[in-house]
A protein has these predicted regions:
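A conserved cap/lid and substrate-binding interface adjacent to the catalytic center
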Residues: 38-135
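N-terminal low-complexity, Ser/Thr- and acidic-residue-enriched intrinsically disordered segments
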Residues: 1-41
Length: 136
């Protein structure tokens, strides 16, 4: 069962994932700077000191899917070492309302699910191999 601290860390990283300046490999002082517009200085420093952005993807907000996701990894010598967290952003742009309509009428936001699966397949495929991708 997750502890209150686990739940808090997940919520903090989920909030941090809404920052537009995230890129793969961001960590330390650069991550703190990127998070400063969204988080308080104390929280931005906490995230920058304890986590690295492993992968960040932002969907095309005009293609019908605006799936956005971030994978965080705890840094060595921190309480979060070797832990991986996945954060996905919710509805924020006009096309997301199209996805919400798809969800309401078809039981799934199909374009966003396809984008999420394709992103996961790309980042988990070994270097030098072709990643399997799905299409609607």
């Amino acid at each position: 069962m997750p502890t209150v601290n686990d739940t808090y860390i997940n919520a903090l990283l989920a909030d941090a994932a809404y920052e537009k300046k995230l890129v793969d490999g961001l960590q330390g002082a650069d991550l703190i700077t990127a998070l400063s517009p969204r988080l308080t200085p104390t929280l931005a420093k906490f995230v920058g000191d304890n986590f690295t952005v492993v992968s960040h993807v932002e969907g095309s907000h005009w293609s019908g899917s605006s799936f956005d996701g971030t994978i965080w990894r705890g840094k060595a010598d921190t309480p979060y070492a070797n832990k991986t967290y996945v954060s996905m952003r919710g509805t924020q742009e006009l096309p997301d309302f199209v996805a919400d309509l798809d969800l309401a009428t078809n039981s799934a936001a199909r374009a966003e699910i396809a984008d999420m699966v394709n992103w996961w397949l790309r980042i988990t495929t070994p270097v030098g191999q072709m990643a399997t991708q799905i299409a609607l």
